[in-house]
């Protein structure tokens, strides 16, 4: 609230030719005649003060000294606003029956204030009268006394000289500028059940509002209305709903109007569309109504679940648009005729029939199990039984294959897949047994011996640009020397790979073809033999038998079997002492040579490129005569693991003296244990 005097002073200091025109300030001083001297007898003076519309007058006294009389009958100051007397004042201090202004401030009820001063014909003492000051100030119309109706329905905003009203969201200001009417028309309900109510329910509903609600369901439904909780709409004892009313209209009939405090009865409309109209006038304080609506329709036949199945959801009845699904017990699947279904849901139609026939729940059949390469399958539950919970047992061909990872037991599960005890759906793997040989070693050193069938079943003959050797890994990889297949690294199909034979020129052998050649990335051709190792991937897996068996890769503990003077065995069809390629597979048992001793042997001429590295190991006799030679390149230097009783590849024939078996020189082999990560990565990636 601001004093108009202050506004007047402010407006006077700023030139605003285009701005709003403020009212002239209203303020001033009033005093009794002769003030500050004593006032005379038989005096009457009247002042009428007027403020602009929207303002009121404020008046207070700075001095007041009048004759005191009973009920201020003699001398007094009377304050009036319109027809109402605000106060009659006399004396200097208030008593039980008389009032003096003291420090009170007086306000006009409107924009005018009348002040009347009167003295009677005699005063026993001299009285000095009064001095008062007045000013116009803005009326805050938004403030109302307790018990009075608010100025605005929702929000009241005071401003100088007036006020205005505004409404909350969802309401609009009525043309009377005070009432907030609800925006409640055009609401459409399309769900099969729901609730609707008067605005603000259960608080008093707004005045001067017209609400329209529509329930619109699909044809075939019938709407049912239930009034719930409470019903309170303004009524009249003699006239039917003259003020506020509720009406319900369908395409068949009209219900209502409704008003009063009694809940209307249930209304079964027999219609799929309903319009509800609610109209209020400008008065009253009533809480309104609430309706819960439902719908019904012609029911469909009650669904009976098939054997080994159940219906969901279970309802007392199913009407239009209601649906149910069929779920089969674990181990059973939905079938419509002979066609499997991922799910089944039927919907009730408006004519009371289901849109789909009932399916069957048939036991899951996993079908005949897949054949296991290098293995067999046995039906445990019963001959040819492949239905839910049936058990089969896979096993690998004995001696030459062993099952990898799981135990081979598979069960037909509810998803229709044969599944292992570890949850695997893929077939088990029959992995070739490695390191089997018909030969045993007693540790004697001897050489140039012919191999017998089954002695070196991992031996591979590689024919390409030259004759070389290799060793079978698993059933589709060959380990060899990089220099032996370097020329064919981009033409793998040019390699002729033979295995399962002892005689180099025999027509009886197992043929294999190369799919890809992998040379170690650290190998540099014609620049020494460091990293002289390669892998050949075969087009197809070979069948493992007594004559074709893979060699084992070394375990971490394998170096304990490859110390100095430990015996390894090299085999191949390389040059013999007579200078010709051997017709029969030959082998030689040779000891491991101290690494420093071997390194020193190749530091002397004529071996400018003969550098022995940590990736190599040496074997042979200091006296010579026992060695691998040209044509043996890529073959395996193998050792017997006495703990597993399996043979493993410790070295790959790489290089040596220009004259094979030369005294003081040794055969140099790629140290396979240094390349286990490289070998495993290549095999797993390809």
Curated annotation (Swiss-Prot):
Amino acids binding Ca(2+) 1: 67, 75, 120, 122-123
E.C. code: 3.4.21.104
Tissue: Plasma.
Family: Belongs to the peptidase S1 family.
Domain EGF-like: 138-181
Boundaries of every Peptidase S1 domain copy: 445-684
Gene Ontology terms describing biological process: complement activation, classical pathway; complement activation, lectin pathway; proteolysis
Name of one Pfam family that matches: CUB
Protein localization: Secreted
CUB domain sequence ranges: 16-137, 184-296
Source species of the chain: Homo sapiens
Site (described: Cleavage): 444-445
PROSITE patterns reported for this sequence: ASX_HYDROXYL, CUB, EGF_2, EGF_CA, SUSHI, TRYPSIN_DOM, TRYPSIN_SER
Name of the protein described by the UniProt record: Mannan-binding lectin serine protease 2
CC per GO annotation: extracellular exosome; extracellular region; extracellular space
UniProt entry tagged with the keyword Metal-binding: yes
Residue list for modification (3R)-3-hydroxyasparagine: 158
SUPFAM superfamilies: Complement control module/SCR domain, EGF/Laminin, Spermadhesin, CUB domain, Trypsin-like serine proteases
MF-aspect GO terms: calcium ion binding; calcium-dependent protein binding; complement component C4b binding; identical protein binding; peptidase activity; serine-type endopeptidase activity
Consequence of substituting residue 124 to A: Decreases affinity for MBL2. Slight decrease in affinity for FCN2
Leading EC class: hydrolase
